[in-house]
Structure formats: C-alpha cells, structure tokens
C-alpha cells in the first residue's frame, strides 16, 4: 500500500490522479508487477510528465516509459550487459554509470554504479538500501511531514 505521506505529497503538487488507465495497468502487468504493490499504486496514480526530478537525479514514470519508449528493449539490455537479476527493473537511465533498481519480487530498491558496487552486488555483498518502494520515494523526494 502506498504511504499516506506519498499520497499527500503527490496531491499537494498536483501529481495525483484518482482514475487508473487500463494502458498503465497493462504496462505494469507486462513487467510482472503486482498491481496492489506500493510500486504499482505510485505509478498508476502519480505523474508529473515522463520523469520525476529530485536530488539532482531523475527517475522514470515507468508506465509512460513502457508505453512510449523502448523500455522493454532497454530492460533486456540492462540485464544482459550488467548481469543484474531479472527481478530488478531500472527506475532511471543509469546516468553517470549509476542507477536505481526496483526488485519486483521483494519490493526493495537498490542504487548501484558500475565498478565495485556492481561487483559487490553481484557477489551478494551489497544489499538494497531501501527496504520498500515507499521508503525509497520518501527519501527521493526528501520530505518529512
């Protein structure tokens, strides 16, 4: 379930949409995302264009990218090149050789960059920094109210 903090923040910024489109639901289902997850609820209801900007970084509006870009191809390439397990989906364009990844099985979010962090992650030595998507989004938008 999406946290009340995220919902209130989204509403206050004019990003919250009560209606869910079938197209966005289908986009998430094509990625194997549970529509009742906090991840799905965020992307089904919150939108500020194709990306969200905060902390000098941007993350995708995943549904928009699945529908309007080559996200599925990029996803395949990411898994093949970086050797990241298939349950991890990128939340951004891997800017500056680093990026955020959502684990669709556990709900955890991970930030890794090319080099030692990627190697440690692949060896099981680096664990996701956020235990769930809510805590990641609350951190990403840097709010506490």
Segments the model singles out, each with a brief description of its role:
Residues 105-119:
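Intrinsically disordered, low-complexity regulatory segments enriched in Ser/Thr/Pro
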Residues 1-100, 143-144:
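A surface-exposed partner-binding patch
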Residues 66-69, 103, 125-126, 132:
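Helix N-cap / beta->alpha transition motif
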Residues 108, 142-145:
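N-terminal processing/targeting junctions
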Residues 115-143:
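Compact, glycine/acidic-enriched structural inserts
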């Amino acid at each position: 379930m999406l946290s009340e903090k995220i919902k209130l923040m989204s509403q206050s910024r004019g990003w919250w949409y009560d209606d869910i489109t079938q197209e966005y639901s289908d986009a998430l289902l094509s990625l194997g995302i549970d529509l009742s997850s906090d991840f799905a609820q965020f992307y089904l209801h919150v939108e500020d264009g194709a990306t969200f900007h905060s902390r000098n970084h941007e993350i995708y509006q995943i549904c928009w990218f699945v529908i309007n870009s080559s996200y599925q191809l990029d996803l395949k390439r990411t898994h093949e090149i970086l050797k990241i397990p298939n349950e991890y989906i990128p939340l951004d364009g891997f800017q500056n050789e680093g990026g955020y990844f959502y684990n669709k099985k556990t709900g955890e979010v991970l930030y890794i960059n090319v080099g030692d962090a990627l190697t440690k992650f692949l060896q099981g030595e680096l664990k996701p920094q956020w235990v769930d998507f809510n805590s990641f989004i609350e951190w990403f938008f840097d709010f506490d109210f």
